Design a protein with these regions (language model features):
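Alpha-helical transmembrane segments of helical membrane proteins, especially in multi-pass transport
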Residues: 156, 179, 186-210
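Terminal transmembrane helix and immediately flanking juxtamembrane interfaces
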Residues: 1-160, 167-181, 213-223, 227, ...
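Short amphipathic alpha-helical segments at helix-loop
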Residues: 104, 186-188, 232
């Protein structure tokens, strides 16, 4: 338990510092100034549904060991053998040039850079008021986790470093703190197919590349995603098949999120509005046409002005 907590204690402050640095380096100055006009209350009202929904799915997936134990699910290891039949020991070549420095660097990429781009992409979409992309990111994130979850329970694939001769689990060997920390989210070290590192990083890259105009961050996330994919193989964790499956899952999730965003969000938005009504959560805005103050339920998306009858679209994160 101490090791698990220590890994979190080390990572969180570092990720916080990187996020602050990224905010000033990767977000244009004019957007930072615009963001300062959002009131804390409106900011919280706007982003809490995204955090709650993504966190719920994440925690569900992390309950893997509990679910397996509760339902007495028998883990079958022959799926790892199937992957070995498909690709052999190709991944072993990636450790033929291993050095301590390269191992530490890839460990940093796998643990820190991956976590950073997931957190920062979410935050940067909020800061840039790109609600459409934020909704697509959230939908794709949930689809990826819910799709991967059954595979991790019923079709486990063990990390390459535990089954291939000549391949070491370089990441876990760096420190028992890392080994214990990783087992919190992957208790049996067999959450291989599909690769979440591949699926989530590629999905985030697609959102940033095609749904934003953040030039500097586009360059950063492309390089980071390539490095993440390489690190998963080099460190003795994933098979190439895992990465291919993860990439395909990212593409499908991105497509569904972009094409069917409005349809998917119809029912959740109704639930949000219902909750806000019951809790009497209201926001005060000014009509764009008559400039009179109007009360609106935050996630109702639009309102008809009672004074002039005009229709005005609204979201807490985009209204100034």
């Amino acid at each position: 338990m101490v090791s698990e907590n220590l890994m979190t204690v080390v990572m969180l402050p570092l990720l916080a510092l990187m996020t602050i640095a990224g905010y000033y380096v990767l977000i244009p100055c004019e957007i930072r100034e615009q963001n300062s006009r959002i009131t804390p209350r409106r900011f919280i009202i706007g982003f809490w549904p995204f955090v709650v929904s993504a966190s719920f799915v994440y925690l569900l997936v992390q309950s893997q060991a509990t679910i397996i134990k509760f339902f007495d699910i028998k883990i079958n290891s022959h799926y790892t053998s199937l992957i070995m039949m498909i690709e052999g020991d190709m991944v072993a070549h990636f450790q033929s040039f291993a050095t301590p420095l390269l191992t530490y660097f890839n460990g940093f990429v796998y643990l820190i850079i991956f976590s950073f781009i997931m957190i920062f992409t979410f935050l940067i979409l909020i800061f840039t008021r790109n609600v459409t992309a934020l909704e697509e990111f959230n939908i794709a994130f949930i689809i990826i986790y819910l799709t991967a979850f059954p595979f991790y329970i019923f079709f486990p694939v063990t990390v390459t470093g535990h089954v291939l001769p000549g391949v070491s689990t370089l990441l876990y060997n760096l420190s028992p703190i890392i080994d214990q920390g990783v087992r919190v989210v992957d208790p049996f070290l067999d959450n291989g197919f599909p690769s979440l590192h591949a699926a989530l990083s590629v999905m985030a890259m697609l959102i940033v590349m095609f749904r934003t105009n953040l030039t500097r961050y586009k360059a950063f996330i492309v390089i980071s995603t390539i490095a993440i994919l390489f690190s998963t193989i080099y460190l003795g964790i994933h098979w190439i098949t895992d990465l291919v499956a993860g990439t395909i899952l990212a593409l499908i999730s991105y497509y569904i999120a972009v094409k069917y965003r409005r349809t998917i969000l119809n029912q959740p938005n109704r639930i949000l509005v219902s909750i806000e009504k019951k809790m009497s959560i209201m926001d005060q805005i000014f009509c764009e046409k008559c400039s009179k103050q109007v009360s609106i339920i935050p996630h109702s998306t639009h309102i008809e002005c009672p004074h002039c009858g005009s229709i005005q679209n609204y979201h807490p994160l985009t209204y100034i």
